[in-house]
Amino acid sequence: AFAGVLADADIKAALAGCAAADSFNYKTFFKFFAIIDQDHSGFIEEEELKLFLQTFSAGARALSDAETK
C-alpha cells in the first residue's frame, strides 16, 4: 500500500525496525495515532483527517473533501 508513496529505503527501514519477533513498538504507533485522533475517540474522523498535513507543519493546508473520501 505504501509502495510508490514512500521511498523504498524508508519502507525497508521501517520493516527492519520491527523485523524481529516482539519488536513492534506499539507505543510509537499509538503516539502517532493519538496525534491524529485529536478528540481521542479511538477513530480518525474525516475532519481530523483533513488536518493530517498540519501534524507535520502548522502552516500546511487542510485536505479537501475529495482528498479525505
Swiss-Prot record:
InterPro entries: EF-hand-dom_pair, EF_Hand_1_Ca_BS, EF_hand_dom, Parvalbumin. Keywords: Acetylation, Allergen, Calcium, Metal-binding, Muscle protein. It comes from the Eukaryota. GO terms for cellular component: cytoplasm. Pfam families: EF-hand_6. This is Parvalbumin beta 4. Ca(2+) binds at residues 37, 39, 41, 43, 45, 48. SMART domains: EFh. It comes from Merluccius australis australis (Austral hake). PANTHER family: PARVALBUMIN, PARVALBUMIN ALPHA. Belongs to the parvalbumin family. GO terms for molecular function: calcium ion binding.
